């Protein structure tokens, strides 16, 4: 199984630790960045994880930023992605087994590294339990999605990257 993983600059070390843990368990990892601690913007990497999953470059995805809120919201904007921000095993398993989540999000400054590793492994190993109710709920969620063609523009995030460089945003 191949797992796409992405993060912002605040939690690169956590992403590397989770990647190494999953590799040791035998999973193939597609690391979409960021790769260092140079200031960047989390939506870029949420989008990359979501696109990797939806293009079948990866089976599932993991997103990590400081709180997990921003990157999980960003990945959920990719059509077809069902991501859940989790901090505990129960929520992660519910997301996968009941809602067929294909990406999981974490706050690397909120949830400890070892717990993230354990939750990620359980999420990956869990299986969706299709029921009529689950299928109907997922279909309702899918109906909310809308395609936004401007997101395909290679310069879609330039405005935000420029603001990072000018110091508008702060960690």
UniProtKB/Swiss-Prot annotation:
Pathway: Carbohydrate metabolism; D-galactose 6-phosphate degradation; D-tagatose 6-phosphate from D-galactose 6-phosphate: step 1/1
EC number of the protein: 5.3.1.26
Organism: Enterococcus faecalis (strain ATCC 700802 / V583)
Disulfide bonds: none
Isomerase as UniProt keyword: yes
Designated gene of the protein: lacB
GO molecular function annotations of the record: galactose-6-phosphate isomerase activity; ribose-5-phosphate isomerase activity
Listed Pfam families: LacAB_rpiB
Enzyme class: isomerase
InterPro entries per UniProt: LacB, RpiB_LacA_LacB, RpiB_LacA_LacB_sf
Annotated signal sequence range: none
Family that this chain belongs to: Belongs to the LacAB/RpiB family.
Catalytic activity: aldehydo-D-galactose 6-phosphate = keto-D-tagatose 6-phosphate
Binding partners and assembly: Heteromultimeric protein consisting of LacA and LacB.
Example GO biological process: lactose catabolic process via tagatose-6-phosphate
Protein keywords: Isomerase, Lactose metabolism
The protein's name: Galactose-6-phosphate isomerase subunit LacB
